[in-house]
Amino acid sequence: RSFKELEKILKEEGESISRLYTPNVYHITRVIDIDELPEDNFKSADYDGILLSTTGDKSDAIITRDLSKTLTVMPGDCLVIALIDEKAGIKGILHAGWKGLIDGVIVNTINMFKEKGANVKNIRGLLFPSVSMNCYDLGEDVISRFRDFAKELGLNEKDVISYNKEREKYNIDLR
C-alpha cells in the first residue's frame, strides 16, 4: 500500500516511479555514485510494478547525475537528507543515524558532490522527520561522542541532548 501512495505523490510532482534507488544502509559514512555501478551490483525487488533497487555495496548515501532517477531511503527513525545542486545536475539522498552523523556521512556526501562539480553554495537540502527527544534511550558511551560532535558544530547541548532522571538514560534529537 505505501508504495502505491508514494507512486501517487511522486507522479503529482512529475517524478518517475517505475524504479526507486536506495542505499544498502549500514550506519556507515560511505557514499556511492550509482551512475558508476554496474547493473548487476543492484539487488532489486518488484513491489506492485515498482522496482526497488538497493546498492549491493554497503553505503548510507547515494548520488546521481541522472535527475530522472528517484532516490529513497528506508530510514527507520534516523535522519534522511535529500540534497540537490540543480546547476551542476547532481542529487543525492543520505541516511544519518547518530553514528553516521557523528562519523561524517553528511560531510562525505557534500564532498562527493564537490568532486562531481557541485558548488556548495548551490546545494539545497531537505531534512525529513526523524528521531527526537525521548524516542529511545542512550548510554554514556554514545552521549559522550554526541556531546563532542555537538560542541564541534557549535550547538547548544541542551537543544540536542536531554537526560531522563527516571530512567537514568540520555536522549538525543537528530532534527
Which sequence ranges carry the predicted segments?
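Active-site microenvironment for binding and transforming phosphate-containing groups
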Residues: 1-175
